[in-house]
Amino acid sequence: MKPIKEIADQLELKDDILYPYGHYIAKIDHRFLKSLENHEDGKLILVTAVTPTPAGEGKTTTSIGLSMSLNRIGKKSIVTLREPSLGPTLGLKGGATGGGRSRVLPSDEINLHFTGDMHAVASAHNLLAAVLDSHIKHGNELKIDITRVFWKRTMDMNDRALRSIVIGLGGSANGFPREDSFIITAASEVMAILALSENMKDLKERLGKIIVALDADRKIVRISDLGIQGAMAVLLKDAINPNLVQTTEGTPALIHCGPFANIAHGTNSIIATKMAMKLSEYTVTEAGFGADLGAEKFIDFVSRVGGFYPNAAVLVATVRALKYHGGANLKNIHEENLEALKEGFKNLRVHVENLRKFNLPVVVALNRFSTDTEKEIAYVVKECEKLGVRVAVSEVFKKGSEGGVELAKAVAEAAKDVEPAYLYEMNDPVEKKIEILAKEIYRAGRVEFSDTAKNALKFIKKHGFDELPVIVAKTPKSISHDPSLRGAPEGYTFVVSDLFVSAGAGFVVALSGDINLMPGLPKKPNALNMDVDDSGNIVGVS
């Protein structure tokens, strides 16, 4: 690894805006972005993927490798990524810093505590929870209805036992007993707000708008009513600054914030993306989950807030993922199966069609694995060419930037200025926005709203939230809301079970299916593979 000062020098960053965290990590003062206003924006490349499978598609690995490969062919590039969540790192998923010869470094530190941003978000979130219950205990001047408190508690850990709890037990000295729950930190609205805020003023204004409860008269109670947004911003003072690290080939990477891609927008901070666009020719950024969730939200929501628009989309696919979506069993996923591949290619086709609805040039990155056969690779390449999309076989995991040169050249050729094309207008009613997304992206035949959802729509209209963008929270395992429907389901009924407003983040969340905001650990969590020796060397994290 190179000292972080050398990485900063590549970007001509001065010492007075850098806050080093050891030898290989530094924060960049978020106010530095203001000084870059007159710099021309580079091109923005959005990396997304086909519908995720249990085996993983290598989207983060591809994002990192693409940025390294662009640098290799003489195109100055920065990759911007979300911060990993500690819970999934210790649980089923493991680390989230890429793999093989295409990683961000120092991987162990990034995957674990990093610069403390997750801790800061959790602290700000839980400060509000504590102040809220303290207010209720000490007279409840705001007349908060304790049966209608929306704000949960949070921790950055997978712990299913905390999904439903009762607090305030043990007598009046401990407050009023009520039901509560914990969510994982990545699902906190504070995390979404941090990722969307462009400066401290914006951050405090957004925090103040958060809806925490209803009062006895069914009126909204916000953080600004409690007056705690300033203290929350104090706890986030350093977390608002993007984190500078490096790739395995010593090229720059910005890693900042980590909002969920279902309950929120699922991408790194707007500050980091805009800063990277000012400092490079090509910014490579990643959207969470598949293109139906992450890419749609990036374009319809994040791009509008940030004032930018992608110049091209990279759709990551693997032969094994397409075979899985074609009905192949995971146990036999590494065996050649052209029939399953043919059927599963329909999933890729849907995502290509969807991305084209946003006016985006699409490049398919076929992430190659050692078990892929030449016939399978040739089939995918041929079918992509029939669709009229560029396709490049990527081997960045095995070969680093050398394995991504073909992909980098294809992306550089494809990237262009495009006319933004959003799926819905902001003044469309919320239910119309949902119907557009369900039919255009998820390929549903019709949309059905539960009675709970219908009541939520009335609340949204009554309080003036109807013109907010919509974030759909559904399973990432299918284009539909049903995780059992692989491939390219269509014509089904898309069911909206509930809606709620993230007023500080600035969107309405539409829930479809079972969405769990506090994951649990598997029988054998990844934590069992981890250890540290007497010299401080860590094993089993990434």
Curated annotation (Swiss-Prot):
As recorded in UniProt, its EC number(s) are 6.3.4.3
One record GO biological process: tetrahydrofolate interconversion
MF terms in GO: ATP binding; formate-tetrahydrofolate ligase activity
EC class (word):
ligase
Q: Which reaction does it catalyse?
A: (6S)-5,6,7,8-tetrahydrofolate + formate + ATP = (6R)-10-formyltetrahydrofolate + ADP + phosphate
Quote the pathway field. One-carbon metabolism; tetrahydrofolate interconversion
| A Pfam family it matches | FTHFS
Which keywords does this Swiss-Prot/TrEMBL entry list?
ATP-binding, Ligase, Nucleotide-binding, One-carbon metabolism
Q: Which CDD domains match?
A: FTHFS
Q: Which Cys pairs are S-S linked?
A: none
Q: Where does ATP bind?
A: T53, P54, A55, G56, E57, G58, K59, T60
SUPFAM superfamilies named among the record's database cross-references: P-loop containing nucleoside triphosphate hydrolases
Question: Could you tell me which InterPro entries the record lists for this protein?
Answer: Formate_THF_ligase, Formate_THF_ligase_CS, P-loop_NTPase
Annotated family: Belongs to the formate--tetrahydrofolate ligase family.
Q: What is this protein called?
A: Formate--tetrahydrofolate ligase
